């Protein structure tokens, strides 16, 4: 598979995970705040796991899925802490997808 093809698949997976598979409750409650139905960390972990699963399925590399899970949670945690806004948040996510595509093709030779 070519880099651009894998990158496009990962980007589509990202938008699926961030917009189609993340409901309003998860989007609100993955950040610390009052009146949550579950502790915020549960929501953030679940959201990161969705993204990790998508990356693992698309690349066939569970280790990249685990890396995505952790990196996605850290990026979203930074946004929750108001370290940056949505454009920076999404740019960091997109950059991570480029890194996963490169690693999949160069290191893991998918």
Could you say what each language-model-derived stretch is?
Residues 1-8, 52-64, 99-110:
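Helix-coil boundary and interhelical linker segments in multi-pass alpha-helical membrane proteins
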Residues 10-51, 73-104:
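Interhelical loop and helix-boundary elements at the membrane-water interface
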Residues 56-81:
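Mid-chain, well-packed structural core segment of small domains
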